[in-house]
Amino acid sequence: IAAGVRDDQAYIDAVVAQVLPGVPVHVQAPQFACSAFVAVDAEGRVRTGRNYDFKDDTSALLVRNHPRGGYASIGFAALNNLGVNTPLDSFAGRAAALMGPFAQLDGVNECGVSIAVLTLDSKPCDQDTQRPVINTSLAIRLVLDRAATTQEAVDLLSAYDMHAMAGRDYHFFINDAAGDARVVEWDPRDPDRAFKATPVRQVTNFYACYGDEVLPNQKNDELGHGKERAVAIADVLDAHVGAQDEAVAWKALRAAAQEPNPEDITSNTQWSVIFDNTEPAAAITLRRHWGDVDAFAL
């Protein structure tokens, strides 16, 4: 944050120089898509479901982080954003994988706070209200490292000007052990891109703060698209109110998953993950292989 983050590549180069001095590694600014929701079972156990969708295939990197003075966390990064899908094939690839904590797309920390980033169709946010500046990747890192509740995450993010990376706009789905699920956004209709935190149960690639204006199965200009996937998730969750266990969460993820479409950046579900917010952990499957799930403890 102190180095300045308004220029994506300059920020990335600064991180590389600090983490991997002298190592010839190329890292590009990441891009993101997706669906996300909160589910609560009969015992009150809270889970976050999340599909990461992106048109180009990628390997998924499991990232465990133990920051000094911060909260431990687990999450996932897309290796194509680090310029290497097979990191074990070369020294440069192994070095690039060390950048994983700065390229995470989702995760959950030891307090049960989870976060997932989803892309939008609005112009990229680039606030300038004289506050410190944070970018998309650092927002994820900040929340996982420093927030013990959703409210703390909201308070942290609202203290910064947002710079959206990679020429796209984004919002964040944040949940905690109490099931306080909110979408954090920067209002596209406000000239100053006012900060918004909207309570929701599920969201995809449209503005939650204008959710009532968004129609399914179409583009809604700057307000986004993908409402039909949110409806599919809602149908599953509504059918199991009070009993949304892990099996129901997988059913909801499957209902919103997408096949490849080279013309749609938010197609092609790369991974589907369930984060346990009550007893922090992750269970993940890659590219819609629903019978092949790997589980990871914090």
List each language-model region with its residue ranges:
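N-terminal mature-domain region immediately after signal-peptide cleavage
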Residues: I1-A148, M162-H163, G242-L298
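Non-transmembrane alpha-helical segments in soluble domains
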Residues: R141-L144, V154-L157, A234
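General structural feature for long, well-ordered alpha-helical segments within catalytic domains
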Residues: T149-E152, L156, R229, A249
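Long, charge-rich alpha-helical interaction segments
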Residues: G226-A247
